[in-house]
Amino acid sequence: IRDSYYIPDSILLIGSADKTEYWKDANALEIVNTVVERMNAAGYTRTDDKDTANLGLQLSYVQKVTYFVGYDYPYWWWYYPYYWTPGYWGDWAGWHYPYSVYYGYTAGSLLVEMMNLEADQESGKKLPVIWDSFIGGLLTSSEELNQQRTVDAVQQAFDQSPYLKK
């Protein structure tokens, strides 16, 4: 399907444990569904088959302060086991930016990343991120307010990116 995308029904948790964990409750699904609604409204079609999708979307929630070293290092994911598993999308070794980038994400941050799944699939190639959104400052003492702020911020990320429309 042309202009199709794949998105999991869960949110990757970063900094929560020494193993990969996912956020899968009703709140997580509301956030995922907000992204789905906005992608569909922009003219894309969701597919359950990541092998036929043109784009992949990953949502990640930072539970504690996290620092990523440089994306230019070819095996950076070895230093942060909570992030992408290298074979998730296929033969790609992982995604990267074409230059050295250093980030410090604070607790309560949501990352939304769109990957080009039609990139060169030769073994060892990087999966390119073609759009991303960093949403910080989501934590308050109210879980209900945190959830509403997160959903509103996802809406705002798409509002600020009108070029995503087909």
Feature roles, as predicted:
Residues 4-8, 56-60, 111-113, 131-134:
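Soluble periplasmic/extracytoplasmic beta-strand elements of cell-envelope proteins
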Residues 12-14, 62-66, 118-119, 136-140:
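Solvent-exposed loop/turn segments at secondary-structure junctions
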Residues 59-120:
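Surface-exposed short loop/turn segments
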Residues 2, 39, 52-56, 105-109, ...:
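Extracytoplasmic
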Residues 102-130, 135-166:
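C-terminal/domain-edge helix-coil "capping" segments
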Residues 43-53:
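Short acidic low-complexity segments
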Residues 36-45, 62-65, 158-163:
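Sec-exported extracytoplasmic/periplasmic mature domains
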Residues 1-30:
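A structural "domain/chain start" motif
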